[in-house]
Amino acid sequence: ALELAQGKKFARKAYCLQDGWLLTKPTPTKPADLSALQQALTQAGALDRPLVWCVLPLKNEALYDLEPAYFSDETGEANKQALTAALAQVGGLTVIDAEAPLVTGTLADREQYFYKTDFHWNARGAFAAAQEIARQLAGAGTIAETSVPQAEDFLWSELGGERRYQG
């Protein structure tokens, strides 16, 4: 926080943009990490249980309009392609790409899904992702259609208009 108060734009691996959004600079995924993931998922698949992996975007990938020019636009997409290729090698694994609700729409729409000064989504973003994951699982017959969370399952809070799950 001291670095940011002094006017620095980069502090502790985070970039502070003029309007106060914090973003991390994307870094390439290491092949060794993908190999370790493949191995772990293959071992988990040997347990003869349904295995699902959900691909979700990082904050800076969803709010790509805010990224400074010196961020590589290709890094996130290259990481996703490498991950998808690695996951395709794992037998019996269902892969769900649940990024659509978080990366489409206007910047103002997408900003509603993330904390401004943290690096992950808020309750609204978590709901959008969970709904997309459940929708795809229901479409594949893995779960019942009635299991897909709906906006009616949440109540508006008096503070900030956030919805909270009431289960």
Which positions does each model-derived feature cover?
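Extracellular glycan-modifying ectodomains
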Residues: A1-G167
